[in-house]
Regions:
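Loop-to-helix entry and N-terminal half of a specific, functionally important transmembrane alpha helix
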Residues: 12-18, 321, 325, 351-374
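Hydrophobic transmembrane alpha-helices and their immediate junctions
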Residues: 227-228, 332-366
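A membrane-periplasm/extracellular boundary helix in multi-pass inner-membrane enzymes
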Residues: 220-264, 279-286
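Aromatic-anchored transmembrane helix interface
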Residues: 36-38, 59-73, 83-109, 122, ...
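Long extracytoplasmic/lumenal interhelical loops at the membrane interface
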Residues: 268-272, 276-279, 286-334
Length: 403
């Protein structure tokens, strides 16, 4: 029996690693391995039912709460008008989150089944493979003349978010090997990754990737060799100089132009539309503190714009999709309960990562939080699956003792 339990856990890890590797090269297969891993985890938990405990705290809890929130909101506000619409973003996200919480709980609770040093090697292999495949795919797309690299995800922004976190996961796995040559490879990985992110044309990732790479490095090592740091910064500066005119400067000029247009009352730009959506979202939340349906949000927004706020009209273009801010999106549809649970999700996950000295989880959560200020990641199927798999695989790195 013990051998069966061990094999089930190992199979769950194996399937999770494959899903992680395929995140940016085959979204369909990524999703399939994600679900198969969960089904094996459920079977594993059935065998382990006598050992299941709720203490110590598991990051599966905040994930479960977000999933339950989405499902309850859907049943209260959307079910009456459309029934069980399997194509609903919120219903789909709730299903993935609820199932992912099982996977995270299983991998976290029974991580004693795998040797920590062996797990480091497997994680290195998985992230290295995933990073190499994604980078090669992205560079190939760029060589074919694609304006914004998007890899296997048909949205360049989401690809940039996932790629940046995958890259830092690989860098973290290199740090764990405690080898000087691999530290050099980690530096090279960061440089290559930054260049690929520039090719996606995603401003948030371009601005945050290097910053979070530095934060993760400082948090992991607690001290940095000055000479190595200076060499690395010089190389980064060189990449910035070479890439400035073709890749960076156009984005800076675009940002300046969009800000100027918004100040003149024109919100028909990327940033301008976001400002309008955020304003509309906050007003929706204030008017509906306990939540509302997507249809009700659209109807209320139309009336609000007609009644003295025509400068926010571009928000109507995106109101049926999302409002490009994780917190405002939650507040506008799920009211104060949705906002409170989302805050708990981020605070508890980041707090857990800090308490348990888990640099990987902390970095991933910080990027998810910061990216969520200008986009909605937890509704994207590919990104959601990637982050849930990474959260599950990050738990063996936590310095906790099982009871």
């Amino acid at each position: 029996m013990e051998k069966i339990k061990l094999r089930l856990y190992q199979l769950t890890l194996f399937l999770s690693f494959i899903s992680l590797m395929l995140a940016l090269v085959n979204s369909g297969k990524q999703r399939e391995f994600f679900y198969i891993a969960i089904y094996i985890a459920i079977l594993g938990l059935a065998f382990e039912y006598k050992k299941i405990t709720l203490k110590p705290f598991s990051i599966a809890l905040p994930i479960l709460l977000i999933g339950l929130l989405n499902f309850v909101w859907y049943m209260v506000y959307e079910y009456h008008s459309e029934g069980l619409n399997m194509y609903s973003d919120y219903l789909g996200a709730s299903k993935k989150l609820l199932l992912a919480s099982i996977l995270v709980f299983y991998i976290d609770r029974f991580k004693d089944y795998i040797d920590r040093e062996n797990f480091k090697k497997y994680f290195l292999l998985a992230t290295a493979t995933g990073f190499a495949l994604a980078t090669g795919y992205g560079l190939w797309q760029a060589s074919q003349g694609m304006a914004r690299v998007e890899m296997a995800i048909n949205r360049a922004t989401v690809s940039a978010y996932v790629y940046s976190v995958l890259s830092l996961a690989f860098v973290y796995s290199l740090y764990l090997q405690q080898n000087v040559k691999l530290y050099v490879l980690a530096g090279f990985t960061i440089l290559v990754s930054f260049f690929v992110i520039l090719l996606t044309g995603t401003r948030a990732a371009m601005g945050l990737y290097l910053l979070l790479a530095i934060v993760m490095t400082l948090y992991h090592f607690r001290r940095i060799h000055l000479k190595s740091t200076l060499i690395f910064l010089c190389i980064v500066a060189g990449i910035v100089v070479v890439s400035y005119k073709p890749l960076i400067s156009p984005k800076i000029m675009q940002t300046q132009t969009e800000l100027e247009n918004y100040e003149k009352g024109n919100d028909r730009t990327s940033l301008g539309a976001r400002f309008s959506m955020w304003t509309i979202g906050i007003q929706n939340g204030l008017a509906h503190p306990l939540g509302q349906s997507v249809e009700e949000r659209e109807t209320w927004t139309k009336k609000y714009i007609q009644n003295g706020h025509p400068h926010l009209a571009t928000a109507l273009v995106y109101i049926k999709v999302h409002l490009h801010n994780e917190f405002i999106e939650k507040y506008s549809l799920q009211g104060i309960p949705g906002l409170a649970i989302l805050l708990f999700f981020f605070m508890s996950m980041i707090g857990y990562a800090i308490r348990n000295k888990n640099a990987l989880l902390m970095t991933a959560m910080l990027l998810l939080l910061l990216y969520g200020l200008t986009d909605v990641i937890l509704l994207s199927s590919e990104a959601l699956i990637f982050f849930m798999i990474l959260f599950a695989l990050s738990t063996p790195f936590s310095q906790t003792k099982q009871r």
